[in-house]
Amino acid sequence: MARYSATWSSITAAAVADTTAFTAGQAPGFLRSGNATVQCKINEVYLGGMDSASNPTEFILARSSTISVGTLSVGNNALTDVNAQAPTNVPSWGSTAATTFPQRSSTLYILEPTFNTFGGISRWQARIGEEITVQGTTATSGEVILSAKNGTGKTSGHIYYEVS
């Protein structure tokens, strides 16, 4: 199994309503499996606040109701073990979609890491066997979105996941 770190830095989130298409740079990012047989297991989600004044922000990790299309960019997706063999189809990560931006589902929220981005942090770790999975190429199972629902906090952070 290959483990990856999907990262972003200095993203100022925009408060985007559910079932509304994102635009470039409005969210930390979108993690898309990209293949019917590729499964991602999310082990950790970390957000670190970078604002210079108090800014409570309600972040959401949710499934997509409309999946992104095209290459994802503006974000880093790095193999954490240099000796691991990367799968043939590597999942995509980024905050900008080449063709169609995703839409966050209004009913499939997974995590809600709300915190003050004036130096605050939010960290979620899965227990073994309780990882969040992303698999396939369809909405609701093939992609998750980390984004703000309320507030405009500036963050950097990462999502650790493994691919099987």
Question: Where do the protein language model's features map onto the residues?
Answer:
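Beta-strand-centric surfaces of beta-sandwich/beta-rich domains
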Residues: 1-164
